């Protein structure tokens, strides 16, 4: 293999201009993502704003309903992964039918670890909206369809999926919206005298 045959190398062994450009672009993008990580509320407000702009665009153009339906299903899939635990509790159960000895205390604190963390959920949802927005600029993605049917399909799919997810939460007793272990406060200072 000669010097210039490796990926991204020019004839003289240095990275090509195109390779350096895209590497630098990737570094800038990652830097912006890193800076936005602690600003959860701002990130979601921007995503909701993009979603609102997308909905207005689809409403005004009166088309691209298939793209919108696909975006809705993609967001539903992300949301279910966000609500699901990283390790499925149904896989951790013993398959034995007989009695077994307890191995854990019932009150043991187990933090909820998501299958899809919040930042990755936000990032994927935002990218999905941007891709759908780009699709609305191409007539090839404007497939004629009777949109009320898609709305009904999406509502049915949402209800069935969420019902299954809620049953799973109840069965395995986990709540995906806890922020940590509960702390209990003692009684208020009982030594205070009553005002008479």
Swiss-Prot record:
* One record GO biological process: protein retention in ER lumen
Tell me the residues on which Phosphoserine occurs. 2, 6, 10, 95
The family database entries (Pfam families) matched by this protein are listed as: Rer1 (PF03248)
Q: Which keywords accompany this UniProt record?
A: Acetylation, Golgi apparatus, Membrane, Phosphoprotein, Transmembrane, Transmembrane helix
Sequence similarity: Belongs to the RER1 family.
What function does the entry list? Involved in the retrieval of endoplasmic reticulum membrane proteins from the early Golgi compartment.
How is this protein named in the record? Protein RER1
Biological source species: Bos taurus (Bovine)
